[in-house]
């Protein structure tokens, strides 16, 4: 679930890696909105198409991250304005998302997917806004419908 200072912001947001085949993302959006009765998000920031978003780093975020890492003596992420902002998408996607580690966890010496073309295809599903009463009520009263929409999108991939 997402939140916003404005209670009027609402709807489903599916975050993806940049420049992918959007077929699964489109199916997720279609099936979740149809089965759960939630609409597309009204959020316009990072929007690729209705309900689908790709969030990448901004120049100021890169500068801030570099400065913080330098101050703490860490090797910074090798990020650009094309790098996926969300860790779960960036770190599991292999070459396509530029998966890497930045030495914050000394026990992790290397990301096994950094040079792999078989990293998993990762999506971040934000099923509505907790700050919007309609979205929150819909989720609390229709959890099974949200799950049904997700299952309906994924099961054809394994048949």
Locate predicted features.
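Active-site-proximal helix/loop segments of hydrolytic enzymes
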Residues: 1-159
